[in-house]
Structure formats: structure tokens, C-alpha cells
Amino acid sequence: MQVRRESGPRYAAMSDTGGRERNEDAYFTGRVNGYHVFAVADGLGGHACGEVASRMAVEILEETAGEELPATGPAEVLERAFERINAAIFDYNRENSLNAGTTLSAVIVGESGRCWIGTVGDSRTHIVTPSSVWHTRDQSYVQGLVASGVISPAEAMLHPRKNVLTQALGLAARVQVDLDEQELAGGVLVISSDGLHDYVPESVIREIVTANDPDTACRRLIAAARDAASTDNTTVIVARA
């Protein structure tokens, strides 16, 4: 558990191995050159490959943000970071005959509360208010079914192919990064790996994060994932202004 109680956004982060032998998730939280940077990565590939890939993702993100901010705009920093991460993992795979990959949802938050968000795969960023939940769109097979109206979000949580991704970092020479901009504006920022949002409904996530401080919210979200029979690694960051 990581908790910040100083000036600026109050945030906490927590990662749980769940029913797995190892934790292939990684996360980053920190202040970088006047911005707050948050990220969750969920590694793929097994046999420690995913653990390596997710760690590479958050380390290269931190390094790129430190080098580029504030001279370069946050959206462009995210684009460059994702390109570097993808290239680094792709090269690592070629050199070692591996198939490591990772998801990544990364957020750069400015002093005004504006959030720049980059996502590959199905790790997810949410902006939660007492009455609504906005979240990034998963790059996954079932998200395509939801978007086309074939199944509902509730049905997607039970779909047998819910873990099939259409994009991941490190598995191809090029990757499509989804970029978004949102205002935090009194809401709560929640970034999670799919061990949370594949098992815990949005209504429960909203109830927990709007009623609790970030530290307590993280603990209760992890507990909710376990109660929902999540056997996956689960990582969550909760931040509020």
C-alpha cells in the first residue's frame, strides 16, 4: 500500500496477487516536474515475462515524463512514452525469443485538475462522481461487442472471451494508443487492472470511492474484488483533489 497525505492530490495505491503465484501488475504514482503521474500496467506472457513487461512500462513512463515535462505537452509525452515502451518490450522479446507484453493506462494530472490519459489494452482509468462513472474504452474483443450493441456491459463481465485483447504493448512493432482528456473537477480518479473492473460492477466502485478516503477506498476495492471471486492480480490507484 502506498499513501500520499501531503499537499496536492490525496492518493493511495494497492496491488494484490489474488489467486496467482506471482503478481504481474505494476504501478507508478508520483509528482514529476509539476505534474502528478499515475499508471497501472498488467503484464502478459507468463513465466515472469509479464512481470518484466509491466515493470518496464511504468519505469519508461516515469523516465519519459521526467525528461519531457513540462517543455512538451502532456498528451505528446504520453504518446512518446507509449512508443518507447512498445519498442523496448518488442526488442526485448526479439532478443530473448519471448512473447512478453503488457497493458497500460497512464494519467498525467495538471495543477488545474485536467487529466491527460493514455491507454493500451484493458487496464482502465475512471473518473467517478456521486452520479456518474466515465472510463476509458478497453481495447478488447468484448468491448467491441459492447460498442456494437451485441452484448451489454453486464454480459461482458461474464463473457468467456473477456480477457482477449486487441492491443497490447510489446507484441507488435506498432501499437494504437487511445488518448483522452478529462477534467477531474471534484471527481475521483480510479485506475485499475482488470482484476478489479472485470469482477466489480461500476455501481460498487462508485459507491466505495465516493464514500471513502483514497486509502480506505483502495482496501475496500481490493476486498470487493476478492469477494467477487476475482482470481487475477488486482491493482488500483485512487486519487482525489
Predicted feature locations:
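PP2C/PPM-type serine/threonine phosphatase catalytic domain
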Residues: 1-241
